[in-house]
Amino acid sequence: MCIRDRTVASGCANSAKSGVEALEAGDYKEAQAQFEKLTEEKDKKKSAEGYRGLAMTYYEQEEYTSALDAFKKAVDTGVVQTTQIYNLMGICAMKTEDYEAALEYIQAGLAMAETDMSGEEEKNSENGKDSAEMIQEMRYNEVVCYEKLADWENAKQKASEYLIEYPEDTAMEREAEFLETR
């Protein structure tokens, strides 16, 4: 089963302009250098944004262990915690096959999304990604994590809940059929 990952490089809204520009241009060496400078700032907010930018730089290079470490430092340093950050942390953990940690990040992100939703669809301002689409991705990946952990009952339950919400997802339909054999 594939991991859903629809995330696009974000603008890293509050990071150093040159780091963001380098990241968007695909100049990861320069982006990394700029964001590392930002992590050394005495201002915790700037430092946290530096770690977030560094995490995105590693993520874009598919260096998931380094990305996850940088995301953790960003959270520990006080970056504004968003559903997107927890989604990316979950994806990084999945890519490194740490499904227990991935499940924790995904569930934290989903809980955050539930408290953030005010009944109307909100746009994720960091990269224009619709929050509803990201939540769908996280719910899908939650099923994957349970499956990888061989927690068949929770995988079946979450797949069933997912299909009620997203009945058009044929990949999950096939997955639910597979899970019924477990």
Report residues per predicted region.
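Conserved small/polar residues in nucleotide/adenosyl-binding loops
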Residues: M1-D5
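Start-of-helix register in tetratricopeptide repeats
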Residues: A13-N14, S47-E49, T83-Q84, D130, ...
